[in-house]
Amino acid sequence: MPAVSSPAYGYLRITNLPFDEALARLEAGLAKEGFGVLCRIDIQAKLKEKLGVEMPRYVILGACNPPLAHKGLQQEMNLGLLLPCNAVVYEHEGQVVVGAVDAAAMLSIVGNPAMEPMARDVNERLRRAVDSVA
């Protein structure tokens, strides 16, 4: 799966799969890495409903790995402000993009060095889930 320019706060890849198949594979990849999908937000539909605007397909998955979330909350009670981990599938210029938040970048703002190993673990799992879409 080809890479796309990823922002400092995320990891993105382009896939040749149709949108719905990419979304299903991302959900399966997240599950394989221990994440459950807590919410699924269809941004295209919501913006059409609320603003009457058209945009390409865009779905956000709010994913949580319960053991890691529990461990993180034990180390940093306010971590809930940064949960769940978001993953996305969207259409851009005729391509389907799949991605996930960079947990290490996100958790760096917490300023708790004890969380760094967990952040790396979460990042590796999210990247494997994204890469599994290929």
Which residues fall in each region the model found?
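Terminal, regulation- and interaction-focused segments at domain boundaries
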Residues: P2-E33, D131
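Short glycine-/small-residue-rich flexible loop motifs, especially phosphate/cofactor-binding loops
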Residues: E27, Q44-A45, R127
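Compact, glycine-rich, soluble single-domain proteins
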Residues: G36-V88
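Beta-strand/loop substructures that line and gate deep hydrophobic ligand-binding cavities in soluble
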Residues: N86-N112
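Well-ordered alpha/beta subsegment
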Residues: I109-A134
